[in-house]
Amino acid sequence: TIQNAPHGLTSDIYTFDGWWWQSLSEVEGQDTIKDLLNVTIDPNNPSHLMASSWWNGVIEIKDNKIINVYNSLNTDSVIQRHPYCYRIASVQYDASGNLLIANSMVENGFCYLNYHNEWGGFETYSFVGENEILGMCLDKFYHYKLLWTSNNKILVINNDGEKIFLDPNKGALDESTKVNCVVQDMDGE
């Protein structure tokens, strides 16, 4: 679980052992971690977690210890920095064990760390521009990646890197001013 701490405030990561909650605040480096947004569990190792930070980049946690903070310095510049901080909106593992990353307000806003430990990314700026990427949803059936933005649009990327932009208000009876989340109907109805 995460103690949400917006606006550049430090935040704690807690783990539960079945009886007690333990903070990672006593772990070296924890006191510099800010603006945690979400955590994803490695499907191949439940004690291996990745967290997205709207300040630091991608935080790697293993056996309740922070073991790495990924940013432009250790990802071959795949994770890019907005002028004053990293803006990682979401991290998720796909069915193949690749870590997918939504990196907001940069040229390559959709990044990945594949299961071979290779970094890569897809250009999103021509679609998204300076609009913030607010979140990411992975389609479990057709493997589309959906990134929703602060300008009320949804960028859809397929496995070949092809992209389309969806406007949720085209054809909608009730217009929306902002996409807050995207979920998938798992039984296809």
What function would you assign to each model-found segment?
Residues 1-189:
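Carboxylate-rich, polar loop motifs that coordinate divalent cations or form catalytic acidic clusters
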